[in-house]
Amino acid sequence: MSEYRAVKGTKDIFPDEITSWKYIEGVIHRVVGLYGFQEIRTPVFEYTDLFQRSIGSTTDIVGKEMFSFRPEPDGRSVTLRPEMTAGVMRAFLQANLSSASPVHKLYYIAELFRKERPQAGRQRQFSQFGAEMLGASSPEAVAEVIDMMMQVFTSLGVSGLRLRINTLGDLDDRVRYRDALRAYLEPHSGLLDAPSRERLEKNPLRILDSKNPDIQSVIADAPKLHDFLNPSARAEFDQVLLYLDQKSIEYVIDPLLVRGLDYYCHTAFEVVSPELGAQDAIGGGGRYDGLARELGSKSDIPAVGFAVGMERLLITMEKQGLLRHIVPSGPRVYIVLQNEELKTHALSACDLLRRSGIRTEMDLCGRSMKAQMREANRQHADYALFVGKSEVESQAYGLKNLRTSEQDFLSIREMIARLASSTKHVEVPDGGPD
């Protein structure tokens, strides 16, 4: 056994589990395509100040959780991306995409990195899928993004999820609320834990994110943000809720929901799963109209998006029994060789089948026919193709259906035509055995 181990907070994903990942990714690609979203891929690291400006210097992510280093002699720090929205917005601005079209719908499935305490559904290297609508953040746009996220869950068969939603108002609303919240919490500062006391000075809204039951009891009677909203922000939120009602999307208004990133404004939302325990958030998002200006744009750019934790989604699906039917697809054909002297014939048949678009495996270890049949069954092959002396002489090979045990004798070309007709049309190449 090797002395080397995966780094703490990371894990290897082997082929059996990859099958579930590929299934989920396939559903994501299909559903978001129905809404007109296109995939974007950004660098895995960005300049550190991008995240400091966008996420917020007082957040736990920037303060404690980023993997940063200085690769260049000029000493400018770069960071492995802890989230995707800032990088997507940076790419959008750098490429001046708004000049080509006012609205861009982008999505991603990406690896992210945070220095968190490893636990179930929370690793230091993790995956998210998410979507960003850049150039629009109207109530209809917000409702569409939420609807698409929920449709992914529905298409995967996930049940029991709860959508929590709130409005953060505009900047002036949040400043008034921040002052009122601080005034309420300061007399209770002795009841706050160390992280909350630090947040009280820097950004008291972060305290509302606390999962500590003692802190939650303190903030239960705190002022509510909705009491500080201006009429326009309140009306806009009501319109979002109306569109969600029209789409039959159930939700719970949570006045304490603020999300963990400073760039959010107006509508914010979160989806929680009862299968995840105390850390129950499976995904969330909201509006972030001011992010573009923070990153150098001359004006705000309407924007709304979300992100979903892939590992947390997998845990939820596993606990709901939704992954049992997902098994690795085996080869269409497994070639069973009678003896090593016939290997060249078997290799030729294998090449022809593969070049005809038929997934084919064969023994490369010199095992007995019995062992080869066990391997064919272990790999969940559909058919076994027998290559023996009599088959080579007659050019009629035994093709056994491993599901029904039915067996026919066919030439390779006949075999290709039969197998291809049940999958997709392919050209039968010339050359090799007939």
From Swiss-Prot:
Classification of source organism: Bacteria, Pseudomonadati, Chlorobiota, Chlorobiia, Chlorobiales
One Pfam match: HGTP_anticodon
Any one Gene Ontology BP term: histidyl-tRNA aminoacylation
Alphabetic keyword roster: Aminoacyl-tRNA synthetase, ATP-binding, Cytoplasm, Ligase, Nucleotide-binding, Protein biosynthesis
Subunit structure: Homodimer.
Transmembrane segments: none
InterPro entries attached to this UniProt entry: aa-tRNA-synth_II, aa-tRNA-synth_II/BPL/LPL, Anticodon-bd, Anticodon-bd_dom_sf, His-tRNA-ligase, HisRS-like_core, HisRS/HisZ, HisRS_anticodon
Protein name from the UniProt record: Histidine--tRNA ligase
Catalytic activity: tRNA(His) + L-histidine + ATP = L-histidyl-tRNA(His) + AMP + diphosphate + H(+)
Gene: hisS
Cytoplasm is among the record's keywords: yes
Naturally occurring in which organism (per UniProt): Chlorobium phaeobacteroides (strain BS1)
GO MF, any single term: ATP binding
Class of this enzyme: ligase
Enzyme Commission identifier(s): 6.1.1.21
CDD domains assigned to the protein according to its UniProt record, in alphabetical order: HisRS-like_core (cd00773), HisRS_anticodon (cd00859)
SUPFAM superfamilies: Class II aaRS ABD-related, Class II aaRS and biotin synthetases
Localization: Cytoplasm
Keyword Cell division: no
Similarity section: Belongs to the class-II aminoacyl-tRNA synthetase family.
GO cellular component, one term: cytoplasm
Entry-linked NCBIfam families: hisS
